[in-house]
A protein has these predicted regions:
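N-terminal glycine-rich phosphate-binding loop and ensuing alpha1 helix
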Residues: 4-53
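Short glycine/serine/threonine-enriched helix-capping/active-site loop
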Residues: 13, 131-133, 161
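Residue-level signal for alpha-helix termini/capping positions
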Residues: 43, 88-92, 124
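Short, high-confidence coil segments that cap the C-terminus of an alpha-helix
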Residues: 46, 96-98, 127-129
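Short phosphate-binding loop-to-helix
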Residues: 50, 56-104, 110-118
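Conserved donor-nucleotide/metal-binding helix-loop-beta segment in metal-dependent transferases, i.e.
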Residues: 113-139
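Anionic-ligand binding region
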Residues: 136-176
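Single conserved hydrophobic/aromatic residue that forms the stacking wall/gate
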Residues: 177-187
Length: 187
């Protein structure tokens, strides 16, 4: 049977044993968990959405609010690795292939539909293979340890990413904060 072609799959990698904050996806923000906020904020924009997790508690939480979830291997070193496994499992399970796959951070409960539309618009140019969201930082108060920063060239191509503000000017850093994992065209 030939696989049905569909356009956009969003994957939210989520693990319970986070290095910086254990159990983060299940932490409550108001009356919902963080993972539910992220999921619901993305659900109306993407054709397909799922949480890729290695933890039964997260899986059960997602199923509890009628979301899609898939169990992945605990050995993954990154969320991107978890997404890659999830793509293959989900495409096989759903008998579909996807032209775009979004890796959506599970700890971005305030992600907005506009952010996703902005990413989708990047792919109107068929040459685009990968895109990421970032905002300019110009206030010292916005700089925090552990955030991901990026340097881009004059054509908006990311040159490199760092967990430290880059480039650093003692008087006024000028960095971009990376606010989303890369999104790429998937074939």
């Amino acid at each position: 049977m030939k696989a049905e072609r569909s356009s956009i799959l969003g994957i939210i990698p989520a693990r319970f044993n986070s290095t910086r904050l254990k159990g983060k996806p299940l932490m409550k923000i108001g009356d919902k968990t963080m993972i539910q906020h992220v999921y619901e904020n993305c659900a109306n924009v993407l054709d397909h959405l799922l949480v890729a997790t290695d933890d039964q508690r997260i899986f059960n939480e997602v199923k509890g609010f009628n979301g899609n979830a898939i169990m992945t291997n605990k050995a993954h070193l990154s969320g991107t690795d978890r997404c890659l496994e999830a793509i293959h499992l989900w495409e096989k399970n759903q008998n579909k292939t996807f032209s775009l796959v979004f890796n959506i951070q599970g700890d971005e409960p305030f992600i907005h539909e506009d952010h996703l539309h902005q990413l989708i618009s990047c792919f109107e140019d068929n040459k685009t293979e990968i895109a990421t969201l970032a905002i300019r930082v110009s206030d010292l108060k916005e700089l925090r340890e552990g955030m991901v920063y990026l340097v881009k060239d004059n054509t908006d191509f990311a040159m490199y990413f760092s967990r430290f503000p880059i480039p650093f000017n003692r008087d006024m850093p000028l960095s971009l904060i990376h606010i989303s994992e890369p999104t790429r065209r998937y074939r």
